[in-house]
Amino acid sequence: MAPRKGKEKKEEQVISLGPQVAEGENVFGVCHIFASFNDTFVHVTDLSGKETICRVTGGMKVKADRDESSPYAAMLAAQDVAQRCKELGITALHIKLRATGGNRTKTPGPGAQSALRALARSGMKIGRIEDVTPIPSDSTRRKGGRRGRRL
């Protein structure tokens, strides 16, 4: 009798997701943190910035809309990203921090600091921290009209 089809032994292949590096050497990625007053994005790419590795937002972590930009949601998002990076073999991150910018506020939102802290506490090595908020040399007219926003 011929052997059954379901009983054949399959060779297991070991799949390596990350680059081959020496022990103790850091593998860097770039973490783009965009912290507005409505949401916080934690987005990890490769060093060129073209290939997305992981992207999590504060809104993906909490139910209520008002909590999307909160420090707690940013912390949860950053922990998720750090865990995914470790699975893929990334051990260190350069940080690019961004606020809304343009003709709006140049101040990062409430989730920026806690996202950065959560990345550091989860065991990721931090390389460079850079502020990449778009600042215009001469902006378009801000919304609100001639007499401004009246409260």
From Swiss-Prot:
Q: What is one process in the GO biological process aspect for this record?
A: translation
Annotated region Disordered: where?
Answer: 131-151
Q: What is its main location?
A: cytoplasm
Cross-link named Glycyl lysine isopeptide (Lys-Gly) (interchain with G-Cter in SUMO2), where?
A: K61, K63, K106
Q: Which residues carry this modification: Phosphoserine?
A: S16, S139
Q: Bias category Basic residues: which stretches?
A: 142-151
Q: Where in or outside the cell is it found?
A: Cytoplasm; Nucleus, Nucleolus
Query: Is-annotated flag, keyword Ubl conjugation?
Result: yes
Q: Which residues carry this modification: Phosphothreonine?
A: T133
Query: What's a Gene Ontology MF term here?
Result: mRNA 5'-UTR binding
InterPro entries tied to this protein: Ribosomal_uS11 (IPR001971), Ribosomal_uS11_CS (IPR018102), Ribosomal_uS11_sf (IPR036967)
Q: How does it assemble?
A: Component of the small ribosomal subunit. Part of the small subunit (SSU) processome, composed of more than 70 proteins and the RNA chaperone small nucleolar RNA (snoRNA) U3.
Q: Which family does it belong to?
A: Belongs to the universal ribosomal protein uS11 family.
Q: What does this protein do?
A: Component of the small ribosomal subunit. The ribosome is a large ribonucleoprotein complex responsible for the synthesis of proteins in the cell. Part of the small subunit (SSU) processome, first precursor of the small eukaryotic ribosomal subunit. During the assembly of the SSU processome in the nucleolus, many ribosome biogenesis factors, an RNA chaperone and ribosomal proteins associate with the nascent pre-rRNA and work in concert to generate RNA folding, modifications, rearrangements and cleavage as well as targeted degradation of pre-ribosomal RNA by the RNA exosome.
The name this protein carries in UniProt is Small ribosomal subunit protein uS11
To which species is this protein native? Homo sapiens (Human)
Q: What is the lineage of its organism?
A: Eukaryota, Metazoa, Chordata, Craniata, Vertebrata
